[in-house]
Amino acid sequence: MNVYGSLAGPVQSRAQVFRPAPEVLYERVESSDSCLALLARLAKMATTQGNVPILHLECHGNEDGLQFADESFVSWLDMKPHLIQLNIATRMNLLVVVSACEGSSIAATLGPVDRAPLHGLIGPTRVVLPSDLEAGYLALYETLLRTRSARDAVQAMIAKVPETFVYRAAEWMFQHVWDHYQRTHETPEARLARGIRMARNPPAGYDGVAIDAEVFADLLRQKNREFFDRFRRHFFLCDLYPEHEERFTVRYDNAEV
């Protein structure tokens, strides 16, 4: 299956009508090592030349990652740090388009200590026929080149092949991670369980009186907003690019907490 190979020609020809014409490059990558090397090369190019690529990955895939022509496999977890570096190099403007079954599954690898691996992700949510991938993504790129609107392009793709593709913005991924953390670590029961562990194993260097588990649990509750703000600034690269404080308006008061 080589869907993007068949898309490269039509997309290149359509791109040539614009001035300046966006550069469309097609590179065949046959192994997981070559894929990770390509991501590192793109990050270097973005850093030195200021390029902001749309990265289109096409291969076999499942919920765990991507498989290449030589049958090597790279998990989404192993790919994540390479995408993070590329996203940092593009100042958090990286759009990743995945032509692989379950191509939107990278969101499941994110945790509350991660930076955003991309600005936006487009991928299928089910096993997809090559013909559906080609039709959907051709509609995406045709509309993107014509309108310069990512929103219109995604809508055209979904209209062409319904109930197949999703668009996940970085804000959605942040909320996905935060919601999971709240469900698993910040319920009253979860906080108490953490408090019990903290009471049994107090912080290194603490030699005061024993502290009840309930006190630790209440402290965790009080620190929830502080943790949210640390995660938000780290995820959206606000420490690297202070302007992202205004660019990404997710706040504790308007997030689902």
Give the location of each predicted region.
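A domain-level signal for caspase-like cysteine endopeptidase catalytic cores
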Residues: M1-G61, L66-F68, S72-S75, M92, ...
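Low-complexity, flexible helical/coil segments
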Residues: E23-S32, A89-L95, P130-L138, V154-P162
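A conserved mid-domain beta-alpha-beta active-site/ligand-binding segment of alpha/beta enzyme cores
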Residues: L145-R225
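Extended non-globular C-terminal regions
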Residues: G205-V257
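Amphipathic alpha-helical scaffolding segments
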Residues: S6, A139-Y141
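Catalytic cores of nucleophile-dependent amide-cleaving enzymes
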Residues: E71-A135, A139
